[in-house]
Amino acid sequence: MKTPEDCTGLADIREAIDRIDLDIVQALGRRMDYVKAASRFKASEAAIPAPERVAAMLPERARWAEENGLDAPFVEGLFAQIIHWYIAEQIKYWRQTRGAA
């Protein structure tokens, strides 16, 4: 993949963006593997949401955004959506693997 400075046209730019988007989707898949693995360590469904963990994660993601020149509120909101979706998926997975309804 070319650096942004080495791109000679929109085709190069779009190819790089598509590659980055694929990397993001693959990272989300790897994240799901860990989310499912975490369910092994949750004694009950009620332990899954872990609001204290979410409360600690979001400001850290906002800080990472700032350190990378991105809009912190946008990134924090994006991660809030990501995290809450994964929590819902982990609950479904926990129920499936524990035989719960």
Swiss-Prot record:
Pfam families on file: CM_2
Reaction(s) catalysed (UniProt annotation): isochorismate = salicylate + pyruvate; chorismate = prephenate
Ranges where the Chorismate mutase domain occurs: 4-94
Activity profile over pH: Optimum pH is 6.8.
Record has Lyase as a keyword: yes
InterPro entries with a match to the protein in the record: Chorismate_II_sf (IPR036263), Chorismate_mutase-related (IPR051331), CM_dom_sf (IPR036979), CM_II_prokaryot (IPR002701), Isochorismate_pyruvate-lyase (IPR008241)
Gene Ontology biological-process entries: chorismate metabolic process; pyochelin biosynthetic process; salicylic acid biosynthetic process
Positions of substrate binding: 14, 31, 42, 90
Enzyme Commission number(s): 4.2.99.21, 5.4.99.5
GO molecular function: carbon-oxygen lyase activity; chorismate mutase activity; isochorismate pyruvate lyase activity
Up-regulation conditions: Repressed by iron.
Keywords: Isomerase, Lyase
Regulation of catalytic or functional activity: Inhibited by endo-oxabicyclic diacid resembling to the conformation of the transition state.
Mutagenesis / variant outcome for changing residue 37 to I: Increases the rate constant for the mutase activity by a factor of 1000, and also increases the lyase catalytic efficiency by a factor of 6
Pathway membership: Siderophore biosynthesis; salicylate biosynthesis
Function recorded in the entry: Involved in the incorporation of salicylate into the siderophore pyochelin. Catalyzes the elimination of the enolpyruvyl side chain from isochorismate to yield salicylate and pyruvate via a rare pericyclic hydrogen transfer mechanism from C2 to C5. PchB also catalyzes the nonphysiological Claisen rearrangement of chorismate to prephenate in which the pyruvylenol tail is transferred from a C3 ether linkage to a C1-C9 linkage.
Subunit structure: Dimer of dimers.
UniProt-recorded name of the protein: Isochorismate pyruvate lyase
Species annotation: Pseudomonas aeruginosa (strain ATCC 15692 / DSM 22644 / CIP 104116 / JCM 14847 / LMG 12228 / 1C / PRS 101 / PAO1)
Gene: pchB
